[in-house]
């Protein structure tokens, strides 16, 4: 009986991991699409896709949150399992924000397109680093690889540096 319950719980955790992977892929798609819109001529279809992807990300967040709540209420996990579920809840919140930010980029695309090439290059490079962060963070979570998770911090520093460069370029263009 106890083994059956644990097996069911492990299956549910695997399902949670699979849903996190799907949500991460949606975030990657939204970021890639948003950046592509800023680099090229008008893409109404791609703009619509990014906004729809953000809606899918929002739905996925609710679905995963529901999975987590069911796991917490039905299984009453402790220690490591509780940390896994609480980490998943934090991750989905962060990934949902990434989807929102991709939508924001789409809305700002007309202004970004008018910017200089260096600005766009930094933005594109920053987006690529964010995609790597999303991919590596989910992969480290699913594999429970602490060292890989620590390496994600490096990407965060790189993204911060790109962001600072973009802000500098933006200030230069205003002056």
Name every feature range the model reports, one short phrase each.
Residues 1-175:
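Cytosolic, long alpha-helical scaffolding segments
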């Amino acid at each position: 009986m106890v083994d059956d319950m644990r097996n069911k719980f492990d299956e549910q955790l695997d399902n949670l991991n699979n849903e996190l992977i799907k949500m991460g892929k949606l975030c990657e798609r939204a970021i890639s699409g948003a950046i592509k819109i800023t680099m090229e001529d008008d893409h109404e279809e791609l703009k619509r896709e990014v906004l729809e992807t953000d809606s899918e990300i929002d739905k996925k967040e609710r679905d995963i949150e529901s999975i987590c709540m069911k796991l917490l209420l039905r299984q009453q996990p402790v220690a490591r399992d509780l940390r896994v579920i609480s980490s998943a809840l934090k991750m989905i919140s962060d990934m949902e924000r990434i989807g929102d930010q991709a939508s924001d980029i789409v809305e700002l695309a007309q202004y970004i397109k008018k910017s200089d090439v260096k600005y766009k290059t930094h933005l594109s490079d920053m987006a690529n680093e964010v995609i790597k962060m999303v991919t590596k963070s989910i992969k480290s979570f699913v594999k429970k690889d602490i060292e890989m998770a620590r390496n994600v911090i490096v990407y965060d520093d790189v993204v911060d540096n790109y962001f600072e460069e973009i802000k500098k370029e933006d200030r230069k263009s205003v002056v």
